[in-house]
Amino acid sequence: MIDIWQEIYSTIKRNKLRTFLTGFAVAWGIFMLIVLLGAGNGLIHAFEQSASERAMNSIKIFPGWTSKSYDGLKEGRRIRLDNKDFNTTNKDIPDHVIKGGASVYQGGVNLRFGPEYVNLNLSGVYPNHTEVEVVKLFKGRFINEIDIKERRKVIVLHKKTAEILFDKTHTDPIGQFVNAGNVVYQVVGLYNDKGDSGDSDAYLPFTTLQTIYNKGDKLNNLIMTTKNLETIESNEEFEAHYRKVIGANQRFDPTDHSAIWIWNRFTNYLQQQQGSAMLRIAIWVIGMCTL
């Protein structure tokens, strides 16, 4: 045993440069493997964290343009979702829809408090909006069902918006009244988002915004939380059925996927998991090849 170690030492001593370069190459390979694993796992965890902040069983529906003629109507027709679609979502698919919601927008509104103002977008939403989007309420409350029913003039502001409007006067925003185009709203809540990016939307009750800004029965998008849909196949079947239901309202071909766009977070998550598994394998293969 001692002879073996002496021979190894003698070989290393005779080939110092080769030994150094070999050791450096191995160390560099290990270092690169650690870096790749760290970066890859960090990316995967970031995706998982983002996904965990929203309800996995949530779906958003956006209107599009028809690409097929149907029922005497030509292709290229714009689909405009409305309250009938909202009611259909809530009432006609009870086996799979827990709760439906909707959003309607009004852009470029000046919101004022005293001499201070900020230009932003108003979003009319339902209470379940926070289940689908990352809205981190940290003071006060969000829109509730009574606000919707009574069309209350209440508003939820982003943290940055509140700072612009109220910080100079050291005023607590909750309970204060702000003016938006000669309409006065009471601030009932403050929220923050992960990006903390400037002046984000201010939230109103859906029915309030739809009424004040003369939107009629039109809306911008629908949301829903679902149940009893645990596989990609069952979700695809539900989406096909939902296109058929909304297609009956809006008179478009149920197989026309451009008429409405369905963003299903559950199926996206499953696809993301498959992508993450492939990424892990790729990182290990590349890392081992560097050794």
Predicted regions and their residues:
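Mid-to-C-terminal secondary-structure elements
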Residues: 128-143, 153-253
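Alpha-helical transmembrane segments of integral membrane proteins
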Residues: 21-32, 280-291
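Generic structural signal for small/hydrophobic residues in well-ordered secondary structure
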Residues: 15, 43, 61, 89, ...
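Peri-transmembrane interface segments
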Residues: 253-289
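Structural beta->alpha junctions
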Residues: 69-79, 112-116, 190-195, 224-236, ...
